[in-house]
């Protein structure tokens, strides 16, 4: 694999993270996750520290979407988001700084979330076609992901792949062709849609 990956995941999903580490060559994955709060009100500083100390030279972030990886997990005893680390990892992944380019982001839907995320199809009243129902929202993912999967403003009755920055795949499909999906996420970094990436003011 030619693109170095950073894995953003909830500790509950350690099993799947370990499987990815086994799948990749050690040179292709950063075996480290954000594990401390960065005490600063300066968003630029926070993102630059995470890029420097954690994401380093990665170019694609793999976001494991499990049953506790959503925006709606609430806060901890200190009033901080329970998924603070994932939020910050995705923010830093999207950050296009002076010494780095943003990462491509590939959301990998874990098996216990298939039915929550993939909800069949519907017949469109606007175009008459059939669209897949994909539930990417605060109940399933972090807002940094959903806001860059369903990017607004948007015209039309559905989003094409060219109209999304974040990409999505089932765990089983990813395992069958990991390089294909990683390459696809990597290529988003220079695609026109990268100019529509949203990082700030999402909450």
Which residues make up each language-model segment?
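Conserved N-terminal substructure of TIR/SEFIR domains
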Residues: 1-60, 170-203
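Short catalytic/ligand-binding loop motif for oxyanion handling, primarily in non-cytosolic enzymes
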Residues: 14-17, 70-73, 113-119
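C-terminal interaction surface of TIR/SEFIR-family domains
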Residues: 111-203
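Conserved TIR/SEFIR loop-to-helix hotspot centered on a Trp-containing motif
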Residues: 69-96
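Short beta-alpha junction loops
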Residues: 68, 97-116
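Short, charge-rich binding segments
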Residues: 53-54, 95-99
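Short loop/turn segments at strand-loop or loop-helix junctions that form parts
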Residues: 32, 61-69, 110-111
